[in-house]
């Protein structure tokens, strides 16, 4: 193996272990966020049984479904990390070459900004093509509020993928794909724009104290997450459609989903669970610290 391959394998392993630990640690917050996002589109949750907010959700889940149910869908989320990282690594440089080749960051800022969005969006969309079914299964398993085997919609990851493929074909596993790609581009635009602006306002960007850098990263991640959150809500709602037939189908498409959420639930509905998303983002910062520590050991 070449030195580059060994270095990638070490990074890949350290990143995977760090991601598995952090994703498992924040899985309860992730499940609360997903339930608040999709409960209006769930056949299992009646209108009078819907969760009133984050605290109500955290209190009721262990009572109604057991403590371990906080980790429903976590396995799919952990597995998803590995192909995503490998694909990002494989495509990242190629897309940067296509969109950012010969572009000067300082003299052609807007071209650099657009190229960064395009390369990030293209790399994200390419990775999503391969890992989207895992994200889909994670959402459906997290949204499954049945207490025991008979009440559950799916027995696990494999059962979810098989049932939806039988019912709707491969297309069923890709519900909400287009709005996911839009969300990636919006997230990157917000992240890149805010981060560059914040760094530009510092007196000495290269010698910034680690605490200040961490605070900027936290703020940028939170802002980008909130700005792109409505796209995440719409894609999760679209995922809930797979397996439904006839009158059970709530949305005829992505545009119809945007329209109906706004009309029936109001603009605030697009941001349900957004606060728990900000809390989960703090877990992202923990990943980076853990990743650096693991690299020292491996």
Curated annotation (Swiss-Prot):
The lineage of its organism: Eukaryota, Metazoa, Chordata, Craniata, Vertebrata. One of its GO terms (biological process) is mitochondrial ADP transmembrane transport. The gene is SLC25A6. SUPFAM superfamilies: Mitochondrial carrier (SSF103506). The keyword Magnesium does not apply. This is ADP/ATP translocase 3. Keywords: Acetylation, Antiport, Apoptosis, Host-virus interaction, Membrane, Methylation, Mitochondrion, Mitochondrion inner membrane, Repeat, Transmembrane, Transmembrane helix, Transport. The modification N-acetylthreonine is found at residue 2. The modification N6,N6,N6-trimethyllysine is found at residue 52. It is found in: Mitochondrion inner membrane; Membrane. It comes from Homo sapiens (Human). Disulfide bonds: none annotated.
């Amino acid at each position: 193996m070449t030195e580059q391959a060994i270095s990638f394998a070490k990074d890949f392993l350290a990143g995977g272990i760090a991601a598995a630990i952090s994703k498992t640690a924040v899985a309860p917050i992730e499940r609360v966020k997903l339930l608040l996002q999709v409960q209006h589109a769930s056949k299992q949750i009646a209108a009078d049984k819907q969760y009133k907010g984050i605290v109500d959700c955290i209190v009721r889940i262990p009572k109604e479904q057991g403590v371990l149910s906080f980790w429903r869908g976590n396995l799919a989320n952990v597995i998803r990390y590995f192909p995503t990282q490998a694909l990002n690594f494989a495509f990242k440089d190629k897309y940067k070459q296509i969109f950012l080749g010969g572009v000067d960051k300082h003299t052609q800022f807007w071209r650099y900004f657009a190229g960064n969005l395009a390369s990030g969006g293209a790399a994200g969309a390419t990775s999503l093509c391969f890992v989207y079914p895992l994200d889909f299964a994670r959402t459906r398993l997290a949204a499954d509020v049945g207490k025991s085997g008979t009440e559950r919609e799916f027995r696990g990851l494999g059962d979810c993928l098989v049932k939806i493929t039988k019912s709707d074909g491969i297309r069923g596993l890709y519900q909400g794909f287009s709005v996911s790609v839009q969300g990636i581009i919006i997230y990157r635009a917000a992240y890149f724009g805010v981060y560059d602006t914040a760094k530009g306002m510092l007196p000495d960007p290269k010698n910034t104290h680690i605490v200040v850098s961490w605070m900027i990263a936290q703020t940028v991640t939170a802002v980008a997450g909130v700005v792109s959150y409505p796209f995440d809500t719409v894609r999760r709602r679209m995922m809930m459609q797979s397996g439904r037939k006839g009158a059970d189908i709530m949305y005829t498409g992505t545009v119809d989903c945007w329209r109906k959420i706004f009309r029936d639930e109001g603009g605030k509905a697009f941001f349900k669970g957004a606060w728990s998303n900000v809390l989960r983002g703090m877990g992202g910062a923990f990943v980076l610290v853990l990743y650096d520590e693991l690299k020292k050991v491996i």
